[in-house]
Curated annotation (Swiss-Prot):
One of its GO terms (cellular component) is phenylalanine-tRNA ligase complex. Tetramer of two alpha and two beta subunits. Pfam families: B3_4, B5, FDX-ACB, tRNA_bind, tRNA_synthFbeta. This is Phenylalanine--tRNA ligase beta subunit. The lineage of its organism: Bacteria, Bacillati, Bacillota, Bacilli, Lactobacillales. It comes from Enterococcus faecalis (strain ATCC 700802 / V583). InterPro entries: aa-tRNA-synth_II/BPL/LPL (IPR045864), B3/B4_tRNA-bd (IPR005146), DNA-bd_dom_put_sf (IPR009061), Fdx_antiC-bd (IPR005121), Fdx_antiC-bd_sf (IPR036690), NA-bd_OB-fold (IPR012340), Phe-tRNA-ligase_IIc_bsu (IPR045060), Phe-tRNA-ligase_IIc_bsu_bact (IPR004532). Belongs to the phenylalanyl-tRNA synthetase beta subunit family. Type 1 subfamily. GO terms for biological process: phenylalanyl-tRNA aminoacylation.
């Protein structure tokens, strides 16, 4: 937010405060100041000149020789290459020895044999950005107003002697995204009440808005407030110099005396407005509704936009004429032929505006304010002030009345707090008189009874809703630098790691030893990504004042963040990736507007590419399901939970491959999943085949693992038997291992799967799985009869339970 010191001085008295002092004071009261700039700094000897004579250069087809009055006895000859130079205009002249933008020094010289005593300048040569220069002067020099005095410094005529204070406004302080909002803030700091000199609205009582337009809002959730004023008999022209100066200093290009007023009101009130050419609407009906998937709109930038049902549009009853809150339509644009203006003021659904803005990549000052919040109490006032200004600057007449489609009931919030609570939080000893003065400076009405305050919050401060907000306001205006500093008190105890911290460090060391790298992703994400890879049902927890839609919802999984990291690396040709992350996810089962979410500590893995790169003696080995499952098994082993963990194939996670995904169970309860990211999901993230896992680390750590039991190595030999099974391809290894383990007897020591085969020889839907079973008796040598009995029981159980064929 750029704030003009001169403009601000019209509302609060800053005669005894320098711009830098003001910036410093604002910084210590809670609004960050990025810097203070004075446009004229670094420029010198640049004056007003009047072109008295202009003739073509004899040796050039694009240069002109000008005789310029710069307030001296004799005219000064200057050679100029601008296509729009002519006699009779007031111009910007850089004298010999002057400095223009870029610290460039201007010297007296010759151009094609003709003497040139300086330079006639464009706005760009004074440091203005191309984006703010009026289009009429984009390719040439700038014309100053005729009342400018020849030979005097040019800076006051362009308000380049103003100080521009750049503020960094956080999302919760969107009220400061307007000059009025900043004026209230500065007024509170210096104990002043801002005085606004709004122009008086004069209406033509003989004509009524009902003769021109009616407004209908299809769904008040989309547009809680919507109104139209009509200004007739306008004449489109350039805006006066003061208005152009203010817009250019705020980084906005002047267009004409109607559009410029809407931009001025945006800066003044923080209220976006839009002006339609009434004749081009070709209808007396304005309908605000959702677009259909078959509709298109050519916006003011000349682009054809394919609309969707997510978009709110302004229509003439039939076809769209504007993309609500984002950009108007070219079919209703203000032009030189416009004589009647339909002026729109509204509140639009911020979520819809954010989505539309993102969909079309159209970020604007208007859409940003709709997203962050607008003072609902001044929608009508902003429209009235704009109508009065348009009538004055364009010689028009405001038709009486306002066409209203929807209105919002403005409520003043009530917040209770006690003096004791304020002092307790801030560590202060403020008395009632001091706190009263602060509330009065802020413009907050209040009632106090023995230190108990009931405070009425004006609508312009919609960010204040709870006790903590009030305490923060007291701290800001009292001054953070005045809060007392105290040393920590209480007993000190020796620090130690909790079990969870100790286990987390163990696991990080384990995973890094396996070649993975730790990633740290944002806890805030989009609503769509927050709902991916979920292990249980939950509502989303949305921020009230998000910085952007990409960081608006608390995550409910870690994997989506890791996939963003994978995509970032893959885009930079880093193709072999193994990431892990330990972090919190947030589940909400209650009302997210009233209750905090439940936090769970999770661990996630994401692997893609090769685990082994090809060299002269090794073949490349790609990451697969068993790579990531092996890491999960290593984690479980460190936790001492191997015997309590089981896996079961699942198709319940839509973002995961239905044939390569498994739930992870801890004693029958889901604690995670492992598998391949669904190809469709991988394509959406623009990543190759990727394998992931996510575990509820908090739940795993909470389980008491069994103690480690050590036993001596048997002095009697172990016996191994192999068994090959022909089974249906749907039968899992885990099912077979469990059946073998349950029936092989007490001497079974180990089961090892050493071969899996599928092919045409086995028949469709079949696979061969070969196991090695190791038996040990620690007290005696095993004999064949014992082993044979165990193998017979195993074979019988496998045949009965899984219909296997023992090969």
């Amino acid at each position: 937010m750029l704030v003009s010191y001169k403009w601000l001085n019209e509302y609060v008295n800053l005669s005894n405060v320098t711009p830098q002092e003001l910036a410093d004071k604002m910084s210590v009261t809670g609004i960050e100041v990025e810097g203070v700039a004075v446009p004229e700094e670094g420029l010198k000897k640049i004056v007003v000149g009047e072109v008295k004579e202009c003739v073509p250069h004899p040796n050039s087809d694009h240069l002109s020789i000008c005789q310029v009055d710069i307030g001296e006895e004799e005219l000064s000859q200057i050679v100029c290459g601008a296509p729009n130079v002519k006699a009779g205009i007031k111009v910007i002249v850089a004298l010999p020895g002057s400095r223009i933008a870029g610290n460039q020094k201007i010297k007296k010289g010759k151009m094609r044999g003709e003497v040139s005593n300086g330079m006639i300048c464009s706005l760009e040569e004074l440091g203005y950005s191309d984006n703010v220069v009026p289009k009429a002067y984009a390719e040439g020099i700038y014309y100053l107003p005729q009342e400018a005095v020849n030979g005097t410094p040019v800076f006051p005529y362009l308000d380049m002697d103003d100080a521009i204070i750049e503020l960094s406004i956080t999302p919760n302080r969107a009220d400061a995204l307007s000059m009025r909002g900043v004026a209230y803030e500065v007024g509170a700091i210096y104990r002043q009440t801002p005085q606004f000199n709004d122009p008086e609205l004069k209406e033509d009582a003989s004509d009524n808005v009902e003769n021109y337009v009616t407004v209908t809002v299809e769904d008040s959730q989309d547009a809680p407030a919507y109104q139209i004023r009509v200004i007739k008999d306008v004449t489109i022209a350039e805006s006066p110099q003061w208005l152009q100066n203010r817009l250019m200093n705020e980084g906005i290009r002047p267009i004409n005396n109607v559009v410029d007023v809407t931009n001025y009101i945006l800066l003044l009130f923080g209220q976006p407005l839009h002006a339609f050419d009434y004749q081009k609407l070709d209808s007396k009906e304005i309908l605000v509704r959702r677009a259909t998937a078959t509709e298109e709109l050519i916006t003011l930038d000349g682009e054809t936009r394919q609309l969707t049902e997510e978009n709110i549009v302004i229509t003439n009853g039939k076809t769209p004429v504007g993309l609500a809150g984002v950009m108007g339509g070219a079919n209703s644009e203000i032009s030189q032929e416009t004589t009647t203006v339909a002026l729109e003021a509204a509140l639009f659904n911020p979520l819809s505006i954010r989505k539309t803005s993102k969909q079309f990549n159209l970020r604007s000052e208007s859409s940003s304010r709709f997203e962050k919040g607008i003072n609902q109490a001044t929608v009508g006032l902003a429209c009235d002030v704009a109508a009065a200004m348009i009538a004055e600057l364009a010689n028009g007449t405001v038709v009486s009345g306002t066409a209203v489609g929807s209105e919002v009931a403005v409520k003043e919030a009530q917040v209770a707090v006690t003096l004791e609570r304020i002092n307790q939080y801030l560590g202060t000893a403020l008395d009632e008189a001091t706190v009263n003065e602060i509330f009065e400076a802020l413009g907050f009405a209040y009632e106090v009874n023995q230190g108990a305050y009931e405070i009425t919050i004006p609508p312009r401060r919609w960010d204040i809703a709870i006790e903590a907000d009030i305490i923060e306001e007291v701290a800001r205006i009292y001054g953070y630098d005045h809060l007392p500093s105290t040393l920590p008190s209480g007993e000190t105890v020796a620090g130690s790691l909790t079990k969870a911290q100790h286990v987390t460090r163990q696991l990080k060391s384990l995973l890094e030893g396996h070649g993975t790298s730790e990633a740290i992703s944002y806890a805030l994400t989009t609503e769509e990504k927050s709902r991916q890879f979920m292990m249980k049902e939950s509502q989303t927890t949305r921020l009230q004042w998000p910085m952007s839609e990409e960081r608006s919802v608390l995550r409910m999984n870690l994997i989506s963040g890791l996939l963003d990291d994978v995509a970032y690396n893959v885009a930079r040709k880093n193709n072999n990736i193994a990431f892990y992350e330990v972090g919190r996810v947030f589940y909400q089962t209650e009302d997210p507007t009233k209750n905090l979410p439940t936090e769970e500590n999770h661990l996630a893995l994401a692997l893609t590419g090769n685990t082994m790169v090809k060299d002269w003696q090794t073949k490349a080995t790609a990451v697969d399901f068993y790579t990531v499952k092996g890491l999960v098994e290593s984690i479980v082993a460190v936790l001492g939970l191997t015997e309590k963990i089981s896996y079961q194939a699942t198709t319940a996670i839509p973002e995961m491959h239905p044939g390569r995904t498994a739930w992870i169970y801890l004693e029958g309860e889901v604690v995670g999943f492992v598998g391949q990211v669904h190809p469709t999901t991988a394509k959406a993230y623009d990543i190759p085949e990727t394998y992931v896992a996510e575990l509820n680390l908090q739940q795993l750590v909470a389980i008491e693992a069994g103690g480690v039991t050590y036993e001596a190595v048997s002095k009697f030999p172990a016996v191994s038997r192999d068994i090959a099974l022909l089974v249906d391809e749907t039968v899992t290894n885990q099912e077979l291992v469990k059946t073998i383990s349950d029936n092989a007897g007490k001497y079974l020591k180990e089961i090892h799967l050493f071969d899996v085969y599928q092919g045409e020889k086995l028949g469709a839907g079949k696979k061969s799985m070969a196991y090695s079973l190791t038996f040990v008796n620690a007290e005696a040598t095993l004999v064949d009869e014992e082993i044979n009995r165990s193998m017979e029981k195993v074979e019988k159980a496998l045949i009965e339970k899984h219909q296997v064929e023992v090969r």
